[in-house]
């Protein structure tokens, strides 16, 4: 991890397109501003983790739904062809 010291009003660059500026310090809180292109997502860590969790759950549910569809189609096939 790179550790930097910045004062209020000072900026650091991440690559060529992302800048992070220290806007203020009050007690143990630091306000920062992030300038980034629209295609770059910027989230607080706890929000990012929630998004990742929701994506994983959505993918899992889609996978379960696909498994159910295959199973349901197999059951229909079996009923049509073997229950005569």
Swiss-Prot record:
Record carries keyword Hydrolase: no
Pfam families given in the database record: CsrA
InterPro entries: CsrA, CsrA_sf
Purpose of the protein: A key translational regulator that binds mRNA to regulate translation initiation and/or mRNA stability. Mediates global changes in gene expression, shifting from rapid growth to stress survival by linking envelope stress, the stringent response and the catabolite repression systems. Usually binds in the 5'-UTR; binding at or near the Shine-Dalgarno sequence prevents ribosome-binding, repressing translation, binding elsewhere in the 5'-UTR can activate translation and/or stabilize the mRNA. Its function is antagonized by small RNA(s).
UniProt KW keywords: Activator, Cytoplasm, Repressor, RNA-binding, Translation regulation
Membrane listed as a keyword: no
SUPFAM superfamilies: CsrA-like
Compartments, as annotated in UniProt: Cytoplasm
Recorded name of the encoding gene: csrA
Example GO BP: positive regulation of translational initiation
Subunit-structure text: Homodimer; the beta-strands of each monomer intercalate to form a hydrophobic core, while the alpha-helices form wings that extend away from the core.
UniProt record similarity statement: Belongs to the CsrA/RsmA family.
Molecular function terms, GO-annotated: mRNA 5'-UTR binding
Protein name (Swiss-Prot/TrEMBL): Translational regulator CsrA
GO cellular component: cytosol
């Amino acid at each position: 991890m790179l550790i930097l010291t910045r004062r209020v009003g000072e900026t650091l660059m991440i690559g060529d397109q992302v800048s992070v500026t220290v806007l203020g310090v009050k007690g143990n809180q630091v306000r920062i501003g992030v300038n980034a292109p629209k295609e770059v997502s910027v989230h607080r860590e706890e929000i990012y983790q929630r998004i990742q969790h929701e994506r994983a759950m959505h993918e899992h549910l889609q996978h379960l739904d696909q498994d159910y569809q295959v199973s349901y189609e197999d059951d229909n096939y079996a009923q049509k062809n073997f229950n005569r």
